[in-house]
């Protein structure tokens, strides 16, 4: 998971903590007689269909001893589940090879309502022992462009937050399952092998006043390790619109050191090319096809006027993310 160094940080999911066998059944059906409608939705859709175990009711045994965590409300958990379904699982289901989502996406997910409050930093999430934990669910807000109370600045804040704090994390984590099955290509590693900073991934660039983009990393966090480099590149490329990606490449189009052979842009574009070849060779996955579908859905959240037609936007607004899908019946009160 990629940290954010503003009001909160997101603890990384090191490769040793992400070892979940994608072929091993994770989800076990439970007795539905005492379940809420949302719990049935989790079991019948996410569990049975994608073999993912999702928990949103607070369980002390799953909470970190290092951070203070609060429970997620069921209404907010439902928003997150629907956002995840629309921008992540349905994307893979529609355009990825058959069975890809079941084998190569997140397997265990725990939702908490608050930030992880700690003595030195506040966390947006972590991934202990392969169990992805997402915090701050109670502050998730999914804006609608044509809402009566629409205000551009507020809308853009919530849209960017929903995309960059929640959706990108899902793609980042799914990338870790890929390199666990098939290691990151050596050619990818060699491009910046001497510049990985491990636990100094943030302080190194900040102290020197250098953009990690110019060194060939899509984010400061990507410089932590080859595995996080791979996952950050995958997740970021997947959610950014083409013009946003190009803007990053323009910022990266400088040499990190005077004697550097390549600019950061050249390194990043080479890494991306290697990643694309790797995904096609090992998983028959065309990342540009998946990205186009992800962009289509995410773009609908931002502004339907950016789309060639309004089809995607109307598809988006037909689904109220605060409610269960039509095949379920919700008794959850409006917030």
Report each predicted region and the residues it spans.
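Short, charged, low-hydrophobicity "junction" segments
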Residues: 52-64, 106-113, 203-213
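Bacterial N-terminal signal peptides that target proteins for export
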Residues: 1-2
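Auxiliary, metal-adjacent structural segments of Zn-dependent hydrolase domains
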Residues: 18, 78-139
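Active-site-flanking segments in enzyme catalytic domains
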Residues: 141-272, 276-283, 287-290, 297-298, ...
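Acidic/polar, low-complexity intrinsically disordered N-terminal segments immediately downstream
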Residues: 13-101, 261, 268-335
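Generic detector of contiguous secondary-structure segments
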Residues: 65-66, 70-73, 118-120, 217-224
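C-terminal motif of bacterial Sec signal peptides marking the signal peptidase cleavage site
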Residues: 8-12
């Amino acid at each position: 998971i990629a940290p954010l160094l503003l009001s909160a940080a997101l603890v990384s999911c090191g490769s040793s903590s992400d070892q979940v066998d994608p072929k091993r059944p994770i989800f076990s059906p439970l007795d539905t007689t005492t379940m809420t409608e949302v719990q049935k939705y989790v079991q019948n859709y996410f569990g049975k269909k994608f073999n993912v175990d999702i928990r949103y009711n607070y369980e002390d045994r799953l909470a970190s001893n290092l951070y203070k965590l609060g429970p997620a409300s069921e209404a907010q958990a439902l928003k997150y589940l629907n956002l995840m379904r629309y921008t992540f699982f349905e994307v893979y289901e529609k355009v990825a090879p058959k069975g890809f989502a079941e084998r190569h996406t997140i397997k265990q997910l725990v939702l908490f309502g608050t930030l992880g409050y700690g003595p030195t930093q506040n966390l947006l999430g972590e991934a202990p022992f392969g169990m992805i934990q997402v915090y701050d669910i109670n502050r998730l807000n999914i804006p609608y462009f044509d809402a009566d109370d629409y205000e551009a600045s507020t809308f853009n804040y919530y849209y960017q937050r929903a995309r960059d704090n929640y959706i990108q994390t899902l793609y980042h984590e799914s990338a870790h399952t890929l390199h666990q099955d098939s290691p990151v290509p050596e050619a990818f590693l060699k491009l910046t092998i001497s510049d990985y900073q491990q636990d100094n991934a943030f302080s190194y660039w900040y102290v020197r006043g250098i953009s990690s983009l110019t060194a060939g990393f899509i984010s400061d966090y990507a410089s932590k390790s080859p595995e996080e480099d791979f996952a950050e590149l995958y997740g970021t490329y997947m959610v950014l619109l083409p013009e946003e990606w190009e803007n990053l490449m323009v910022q990266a189009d400088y040499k990190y050191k005077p004697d550097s052979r390549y600019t950061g842009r050249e390194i990043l574009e080479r890494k991306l090319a290697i990643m694309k070849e790797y995904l096609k060779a090992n998983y028959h996955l065309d990342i540009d096809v998946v990205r186009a579908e992800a962009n289509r859905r995410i773009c609908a959240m931002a502004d339907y006027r950016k789309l060639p037609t309004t089809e995607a936007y109307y598809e988006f607004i037909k689904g109220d993310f605060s409610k269960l899908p039509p095949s379920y019946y919700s008794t959850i009160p409006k917030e």
